[in-house]
Amino acid sequence: MSSSQESTFTSASAAAQVNASALDLLPVYAKELIAGGAAGAFAKTAVAPLERVKILLQTRTEGFQSLGILQSLRKLWQYEGIRGFYKGNGASVLRIVPYAALHYMTYEQYRCWILNNSASSIGTGPVVDLLAGSAAGGTAVLCTYPLDLARTKLAYQVSNVGQTGNALGNSGQQQTYNGIKDVFKTVYKEGGARSLYRGVGPTLIGILPYAGLKFYIYEDLKSQVPDDYKDSVILKLSCGALAGLFGQTLTYPLDVVRRQMQVQSKQSQNSSDGFRIRGTFQGLLLIIRCQGWRQLFAGLSLNYVKVVPSVAIGFTTYDMMKALLGVPPRERVHASGGNK
């Protein structure tokens, strides 16, 4: 029996060594992709109910226009049950995994490139994080935007479960979608591949400063922390949360324009009521004129509630996954150059 236990232990040890050696063979950028994807999935799922309510408020969905956060959550529970909290989350996670993976990985890559090629002219301070974060945000958005469009259209639908009649929040003209694939097929039929990127303008205009500011503020705040507390998870989370809150406040109106552009159907664009968003700045002015300036900040308080845990979970998971996968410290990566 002893020999059997020893054999089992030896086999387990050998398997662990094989797994460890396999991880060692992965390039650093692949490990950063894995860590970033895991961070995005955990963070997005944790705040999915709040994200659903935020979209309903941003798009002025009928029945939710005058409700607060708790009232909206209760209404979703009443008509759709717990599944209503996560409607569109499949598309959201499907988008956020490649988005977060690309965002974190390209941020590290852009940062390394800037330091290796432009450090003499722009220095090595937080401005590097501003530039790298902005470039990474734009790259990730362009690669994953159709999935964000699908997520928004699915979350915009509110079903009146168990009752007849139109779905809550959707007029008779609104298209009903049965999943991510159905969204892609329907939107593509409406206007081709270009329709899959409806609203990408305000998204890019918003993400470039937001992503840059988030990394800039996060790294700048971390640099102010005394050396004895540099490894404190709580302080890292606090820095990340503050960075996220500040960046969100500055760029939130652009997010509202993006959401309203995304839920516009071909029918609504051809309507005679005059409300049709054609571009970012025209959309800002149109919303102010027709819906009031407060609509540009609809759901912002909810976003504050959402951003704090989302950023906290995202940064924490990313750091934990990097440690688990054996990603070397940033300074070592830059020094070696070739690892990247």
UniProtKB/Swiss-Prot annotation:
The entry's keywords: Membrane, Mitochondrion, Mitochondrion inner membrane, Repeat, Transmembrane, Transmembrane helix, Transport
| Gene Ontology MF terms | coenzyme A transmembrane transporter activity
PROSITE patterns on file: SOLCAR
**Tissue expression profile of the protein:** Expressed throughout the plant.
One GO biological process term: mitochondrial coenzyme A transmembrane transport
Q: Where in the cell is it found?
A: Mitochondrion inner membrane
Highest taxon, organism lineage: Eukaryota
Bilayer-crossing regions? 22-42, 85-105, 130-147, 199-219, 237-257, 297-317
Mode of membrane association: Multi-pass membrane protein
Spans of Solcar repeats, please give.
27-113, 124-224, 231-324
- Any one cellular-component term (Gene Ontology): mitochondrial inner membrane
Spell out the family assignment given in the record's similarity comment. Belongs to the mitochondrial carrier (TC 2.A.29) family.
The protein's job, in short, is: Required for the accumulation of coenzyme A in the mitochondrial matrix.
PANTHER family with a match to the protein in the record? SOLUTE CARRIER FAMILY 25
By what name is this protein known? Mitochondrial carrier protein CoAc1
- Protein species of origin: Zea mays
The gene from which this protein is expressed is COAC1
